[in-house]
Amino acid sequence: MSSQDILKQPALFLTQNQRELYFEQGYLMFPGLISTSELEVFRVLVSKIVDSTRTITSSSNKIDLEKGHTAENPRLRRVTYVDDKDPHCWRLCADSVIPDIAADLLGPDVRFRDMMLNFKWADGGAEVKWHQDICFYPHTHLGSMQFLVFLEEVSSEQGPLQVIPASHKGPIFEHYDDSNEWTGAISPADLSTAGIDDATELTGPAGT
């Protein structure tokens, strides 16, 4: 659906101004959207997942280990398909305000893909370079979006996620190098035109 057609649909959660702002800047923030009680359940689940990796020494297609991972000090980069691991995760994806927001911005027919945990540890970790998420998807249709939920408070001191407002209106940059190898990042040559000087940090309390 076009943005004009989507905006004609009755909203389930967002105001019309919020919907229009999304199409203008390409993202929205909802501080403290997820309740403290919901977050506590998630934190327990995450702790169990981390503990379960103490005996793992190499990454798999579902669990990506951070460099320096040990049984004594487990460090993960990401865990995929978390919605398959616990019914609470699936409820957040399918029976919460999140699918209502998705419908307000994508149209009434929404398809869920998967839920993933990204870990950002203290004392450094793997660098995440400037990239465009759509380049990671096996889709040619641009009508997709990601929802990110902070399980803990995120401040500027923690090196938070940054986004470039309105960059969705610009070009999709190549994420392969000159040897046609996947890099998962915008090339240094393209960064000068990607608008990174206009980037804004996404910070907020847990549940944002």
Q: What is each residue range found by the language model?
A:
Residues 11, 27-29, 146-150, 163, ...:
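Conserved hydrophobic/aromatic beta-strand scaffold that supports enzyme active sites
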Residues 105, 131, 138-156, 203-205:
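Short, conserved beta-strand element in jelly-roll/cupin
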Residues 108, 122-124, 153-156, 169:
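Short, charged/polar surface micro-motifs in flexible loops or helix N-caps
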Residues 154-208:
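Double-stranded beta-helix
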